[in-house]
Amino acid sequence: MLTAKDIMTNKVISVTPDTSIEELSSILVKNEISGVPVVDDSGLLYGIVTENDLISQNKRLHIPTVVSFLDAAIYLESSKKFEQDVKRLTATKVKEICTRKVVTISEDISLVDIATLMAEKKVQLLPVVKAGKVIGIVGKRDMVKAVARQAE
């Protein structure tokens, strides 16, 4: 039976609570990932932040509405408002938008239990934690890869 330890990503990219949203966005894009754990100075799990947190309607942060047309960005709001939103966005810290109540797993949990947890809790990323520290992360992509490997 496969467990989280078998499929988790071991080299976890993380950020701190004081990481800027600008830096977070760059990390997510550069590494082609949808979210990262937030860890404090001692390496303990503080929270988790995802792309959804960046665009969530119920957060105080507002990303301007943009339409892409023929490779040009068209802002659906005034340019002055856009500039204000960008300034506010770059000044915002991860601690202001991250989820503090994080659903975590241990490395010995089965894939079936991981899938159930993801579905029930409606989460896409599960930090694998040992003694309060993140030792890995399991995302939906890891689950799909595991299923594909078993099918071969």
PLM regions: where:
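N-terminal short leaders/motifs
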Residues: 47-57, 61, 81-83
